[in-house]
Amino acid sequence: MSNVNHNSWFEKGMSFAAYKESMDVNKEELSRVYDQLTFTDEDLAVWKDLSQRNWKGVVLTADWCGDASLCVPVIQRIAEESNIELRFLIRDENLELMDQYLTNGTARAIPIFIFLDQDGYEARVWGPRSPEVQEMITTARAGLPAADAPDFEEKQKELYRNFKQQISTDPAMWRTVIESVKAKLQG
């Protein structure tokens, strides 16, 4: 956990409505997940308990990111149920913050959700994917031809097209994010 206060980043961020309005690429997918997502009674009880913490959050994201089209709407809905106000920052416009949250110490992978306590200090960090989604994409990438193969680019585009379709339409994928975030926030 960071002992750096992130209130200024929170204040700089966009609301969910403003972020969604700014989208060009994955707005339809994000909206579909947001509108169709459902929670169990157990989920709702956890979200209610979390609402007592008076947290807020900063999200590093970008419209072009397929993972964000899955994770942002799921976690926005969790935040709404948990009384956690999220603010959204575009990754490439906020590299000073992004570089504090590199995946595996090197990658500017997004989305990254930085949950802040009532004083603006980091309480939890989640992202960029649930372990199950990471395993799925790792397995799929392993099936790609070598990077210098003539059909690599075509096969890679097909892989990401299929991945984007699955994560924006399959409630089982949404559930992996719910469970992963729930475990992180309760911890």
Please annotate each region the language model reported:
Residues 1-55, 80-81, 85, 99-108, ...:
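Non-globular targeting/processing and membrane-anchoring segments
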Residues 39-41, 68-70, 95-97:
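Short amphipathic alpha-helical surface micro-motifs
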Residues 58-61, 75, 83-98, 116-118:
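Thiol-based oxidoreductase modules, predominantly thioredoxin-like and allied folds used
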Residues 65, 94, 121, 131:
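Surface-exposed, flexible loop/turn segments at secondary-structure boundaries
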